[in-house]
């Protein structure tokens, strides 16, 4: 039986972080957590991290698609915050962002990890951006590091 598992140290990886400016007071903490994890735990040089700001979470997939198509990066981390309001807008933005990012990831065989919060209120967002519930940006970075290694191992098997 063959088993593929991986660690999180990927010194030579290039990663793109796409971050929404909307709800930036939350997203900046997610970004900080992601960069800290990539550099401190993943041992990635800051010069190998491209950070792109977009207006909102809805705009993340088009930039992710462009980056994935360049074939220059090993992973993409999506960072945004969608807080439920009084309309269905929340659901549409979240569903479109997640489904489009998933489609892009499988189309281009590039890990795209989700540091996108979908919360009921601002308090939940604050809790998930570095306080009581951890930092989802950091968790997305950890997932990206592991997935980079897994994808490298899969490519070796098939070559």
From Swiss-Prot:
The keyword Transferase applies. Signal peptide: none annotated. The active site is at residue 89. Pathway: Cofactor biosynthesis; riboflavin biosynthesis; riboflavin from 2-hydroxy-3-oxobutyl phosphate and 5-amino-6-(D-ribitylamino)uracil: step 1/2. GO terms for biological process: riboflavin biosynthetic process. InterPro entries: LS, LS/RS, LS/RS_sf. SUPFAM superfamilies: Lumazine synthase. It is an enzyme of class 2 (transferase). (2S)-2-hydroxy-3-oxobutyl phosphate binds at residues 86-87, 128. It catalyses: (2S)-2-hydroxy-3-oxobutyl phosphate + 5-amino-6-(D-ribitylamino)uracil = 6,7-dimethyl-8-(1-D-ribityl)lumazine + phosphate + 2 H2O + H(+). Its EC number is 2.5.1.78. 5-amino-6-(D-ribitylamino)uracil binds at residues 22, 57-59, 81-83, 114. GO terms for molecular function: 6,7-dimethyl-8-ribityllumazine synthase activity. It comes from the Bacteria. Keywords: Riboflavin biosynthesis, Transferase. GO terms for cellular component: cytosol; riboflavin synthase complex. The keyword Transferase applies. Catalyzes the formation of 6,7-dimethyl-8-ribityllumazine by condensation of 5-amino-6-(D-ribitylamino)uracil with 3,4-dihydroxy-2-butanone 4-phosphate. This is the penultimate step in the biosynthesis of riboflavin. Belongs to the DMRL synthase family. Forms an icosahedral capsid composed of 60 subunits, arranged as a dodecamer of pentamers. This is 6,7-dimethyl-8-ribityllumazine synthase. It comes from Buchnera aphidicola subsp. Schizaphis graminum (strain Sg).
């Amino acid at each position: 039986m063959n088993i593929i598992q991986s660690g999180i140290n990927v010194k030579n990886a290039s990663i793109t972080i796409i971050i929404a400016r909307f709800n930036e007071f939350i997203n900046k903490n997610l970004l900080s957590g992601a960069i800290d994890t990539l550099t401190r735990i993943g041992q990635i040089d800051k010069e190998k991290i491209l950070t792109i700001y977009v207006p909102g979470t809805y705009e993340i997939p088009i930039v992710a698609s462009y980056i994935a198509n360049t074939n220059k990066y090993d992973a993409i981390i999506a960072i945004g915050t969608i807080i439920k309001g009084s309309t269905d807008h929340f659901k549409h933005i979240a569903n479109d962002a997640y489904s489009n990012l998933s489609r892009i990831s499988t189309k281009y065989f590039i890990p795209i990890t989700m540091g996108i919060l979908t919360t009921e209120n601002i308090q939940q967002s604050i809790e998930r951006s570095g306080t009581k519930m951890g930092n989802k940006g950091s968790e997305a970075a950890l997932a990206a590091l592991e997935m980079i290694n897994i994808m490298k191992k899969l490519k070796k098997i098939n070559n």
